[in-house]
Regions:
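Thiamine diphosphate
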Residues: 1-147
C-alpha cells in the first residue's frame, strides 16, 4: 500500500541537485513530461529541479521561492490547460516579490481531441518543449555573461 501523504498546500520535489539550473513546476499529466525532460537534460549533464505542485490552491509558496532562489531565479510552469487562473498564475504570484522569472508553458488554443502525445506536443507542453525552454534560458544567460 502507498503510504505517501499529500497535504493541502503542499508539493513534492521529485528531483533536486545542487547543480540545478532551473526549476520545472508541473501538475497532473505534465508531471510525466517534466520527468521525461529531466531525464533528457540529465543525459546532457544539465540538472533541473522538478516539483509536482499537486496543490495549486493554496500553492506551496515556501518550496517554490526556495527552489527559484536556488536555481538561478528561473522557474518554468507547465500546465495542461489555459494559462489564466491556473498553475502559472499561482506560481507567478507566489514568487513575484523575489525577482524570480516564470516561463509559462500552457494550452493557448481551443483544445482538440487526439492522442495525448500529439496534443502535448501541439500545445507546447511536452517534454521536448520543456527541454527547449531550459536550453533557451541557458543560451540567453551565456550570451549575457559574454557581453
Amino acid at each position: 500500500a502507498n503510504e505517501e501523504s499529500f497535504d493541502i498546500g503542499g508539493s513534492k520535489v521529485l528531483y533536486e541537485n545542487v547543480d540545478d539550473v532551473a526549476t520545472v513546476v508541473a501538475a497532473g499529466i505534465t508531471v510525466f513530461e517534466a520527468r521525461e525532460a529531466y531525464q533528457r537534460l540529465l543525459k546532457e549533464g544539465v540538472h533541473i529541479r522538478v516539483i509536482d505542485a499537486y496543490s495549486i490552491q493554496p500553492i506551496d509558496t515556501p518550496t517554490l521561492v526556495l527552489a527559484g532562489l536556488q536555481t538561478g531565479r528561473k522557474i518554468i510552469s507547465v500546465e495542461d490547460h489555459y494559462p489564466s487562473g491556473g498553475l502559472g498564475d499561482a506560481v507567478s504570484e507566489a514568487v513575484a516579490d523575489h525577482g524570480i522569472t516564470v516561463s509559462r508553458l500552457a494550452v493557448r488554443e481551443v483544445p482538440r481531441s487526439g492522442k495525448s502525445e500529439e496534443l502535448l506536443e501541439r500545445y507546447g507542453i511536452s517534454a521536448s518543449h520543456i527541454v527547449e525552454t531550459v536550453r533557451r534560458q541557458l543560451d540567453s544567460e551565456q550570451r549575457i555573461a559574454k557581453s
